[in-house]
Amino acid sequence: MSFLDKFFGKEKSSAKSASDRLKLVLAHERAVNLPYLEEMKREILEVIKKYTHAEKIEIKADSNQQIDTLEVEIVLGKNS
């Protein structure tokens, strides 16, 4: 181990980097291709619109090796 490796660490091998990128792409594809996801998003949007005056609604799906997540961000408007 060289002197600089102690401070900056070793660079990842290209195989490890490629493997990490592939895992990320596969996880994203898995999250996006859930068969019920589009209908679930539509239903969530309907419920949010029914009960709020949201200025912005954003729904994001994500997946990693252990868990699938659905993140909903709602910006509520001021009450009139």
Swiss-Prot record:
Q: What Gene3D superfamilies does the record tag this protein with?
A: Cell division topological specificity factor MinE
- UniProt keywords, alphabetically: Cell cycle, Cell division
Give the GO biological process terms: cell division; regulation of division septum assembly
Does the keyword Plastid feature in the UniProt annotation?
no
User: For this UniProt entry, which residues form the secretion signal?
Assistant: none
Record flagged with keyword Glycoprotein: no
Q: Which InterPro entries match?
A: MinE (IPR005527), MinE_sf (IPR036707)
* The family this protein is said to belong to: Belongs to the MinE family.
Q: What does this protein do?
A: Prevents the cell division inhibition by proteins MinC and MinD at internal division sites while permitting inhibition at polar sites. This ensures cell division at the proper site by restricting the formation of a division septum at the midpoint of the long axis of the cell.
Q: What is this protein called?
A: Cell division topological specificity factor
Q: Species name for this entry? A: Wolinella succinogenes (strain ATCC 29543 / DSM 1740 / CCUG 13145 / JCM 31913 / LMG 7466 / NCTC 11488 / FDC 602W) (Vibrio succinogenes)
As recorded in Swiss-Prot or TrEMBL, the protein's gene is named minE
